[in-house]
Amino acid sequence: WQADSEEKYMAGVMDKWKALAVPRKEFLELIRGLEGWAGVDMSKRIDLTADAHVFWLPDGRLAVTAHGFMPEETATKHEHTDRVPYKHWAREGWCTLTPGSVTDYKFIANHLDEFEFDNGVTILEECYDGHQAWHFMQEREAAGKTVVEIRQGAQTLSEPTKYFRELVFQGRVVHDGSPLLTWCLSNAVEVVDSNGNIKLSKKHKDDSQRIDLAAAVINALVRAMVNEAQPDVSEFADEQFLDKLWG
């Protein structure tokens, strides 16, 4: 991958993104009973790790939520380096601080299972970067989940990365207002190659401007795009119009 240019991924659309938030309770009511996709972004066990869930609503909008995980013992250090309130966000339910000094992946598995059960949703596929999460993927598959490896190259990631931003620009996204996901999106840098392909990156490899929750959303969207439903326009149109529309 040879980058030709870099700029902020959500430049010019962060205000739109923030305006598309709804209260958490309202968000969960929107997705109840739907089928969706999960994405997971696994980092080093001492850093931020994330899962995300995306759903196509009947009106054609994409519903997006994401959750972070971090070791409890490193949270204070990361609050100083990253300059964000992880412990406060954990109390508000936007992330989970796992006991000890490394992230216990059992908490991620439990969160994926509980999210599906508690909200009455059906997760069709769990999407992973196989390089980082191979063992975890095998465990999830053994538990009966459908897992998909998402290759982290330009051909796989460019289109969904562009499409997500386009959906935000069009107002076709709804989310639960997670300050952690919003922070990750605001940090993400768009790396463009000579063919115009893009992918998300941090500004520097060891940068504290983390993007993990945004990366998890894109992993899920790779598969959700393959299965994008046509919006249900029946509530907006009469039968005569629908007959013409669908032939």
Question: Where are the model-predicted features located?
Answer:
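ATPase catalytic-site recognition across NTP-hydrolyzing enzymes
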Residues: 1-37
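Phosphate/oxyanion-binding active-site loops and adjacent basic polyanion-contact surfaces
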Residues: 9-16, 47, 99-111, 128, ...
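Gly/Thr-rich phosphate-binding beta-strand-loop-beta motif of the actin/hexokinase/Hsp70
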Residues: 31-56, 62
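An acidic- and aromatic-residue-enriched active-site/binding cleft used to recognize and process polar
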Residues: 41-45, 56, 69, 128-133, ...
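Metal-dependent DNA phosphodiester-chemistry modules and their immediately adjacent helices/loops
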Residues: 82-91, 139-231
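Short glycine-rich phosphate-binding loop at a beta-alpha junction
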Residues: 120-132, 136-137
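Acidic two-metal-ion nuclease catalytic site recognized across multiple nuclease folds
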Residues: 221-247
